[in-house]
């Protein structure tokens, strides 16, 4: 999961929790069913949108109006959840309902209702299957732990370890 679909962006738009408050969402609601212009449906736990995270109806990405490839005119962003339950592009409407009332696209195929992202990482340097001389190899990549954050990263072998928060001269264990 992830691969080249993981990235960083600064999103701008309207807080989804504010929209739900203005709409007077029923406290019994469990699921937001968002629909996209291409017919795709997504089920998002209402609790995830109302728990304080910055869930958005995004209209901007990195200070620019959304491009069509990123979901113009509006897309849903719910940090900490995998996209199949939180990232509808080209949003046309959102229904507030229960889980029993509707099975969105991936739920119909047996996927989970809730899909929190867990701590994980990806190594981008060196590229997969590239060849290197014996000895020290520089690693580069990303680590993420939604909602908790990442304080440091430790990469090592059986003989040495280096952490991202340790000066190089002190990093070999």
What is each PLM-predicted segment?
Residues 1-153, 173:
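Structured, non-membrane catalytic/scaffold regions adjacent to prosthetic-group chemistry
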Residues 155, 165-170:
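Short amphipathic, helix-prone segments within low-complexity/disordered or flexible regions
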């Amino acid at each position: 999961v992830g691969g080249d679909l993981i990235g960083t962006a600064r999103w701008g738009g309207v807080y989804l929790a504010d929209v739900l408050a203005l709409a007077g969402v029923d406290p019994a609601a469990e699921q937001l069913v968002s629909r996209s212009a291409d017919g795709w449906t997504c089920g998002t736990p209402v609790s995830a949108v109302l728990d304080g995270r910055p869930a958005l109806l995004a209209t901007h990405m990195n200070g620019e109006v959304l491009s069509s490839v990123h979901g113009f005119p509006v897309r849903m962003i719910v940090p900490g959840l995998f996209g199949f339950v939180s990232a509808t592009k080209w949003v046309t409407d959102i229904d507030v309902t229960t889980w029993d009332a509707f099975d969105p696209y991936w739920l119909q195929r047996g996927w989970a209702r809730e899909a929190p992202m867990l701590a994980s990482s990806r190594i981008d340097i060196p590229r997969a299957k590239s060849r290197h001389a014996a000895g020290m190899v520089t690693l580069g990549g990303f680590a993420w732990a939604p909602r908790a954050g990442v304080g440091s990263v430790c990469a090592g072998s059986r003989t040495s370890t280096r952490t991202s928060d340790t000066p190089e001269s002190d990093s070999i264990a």
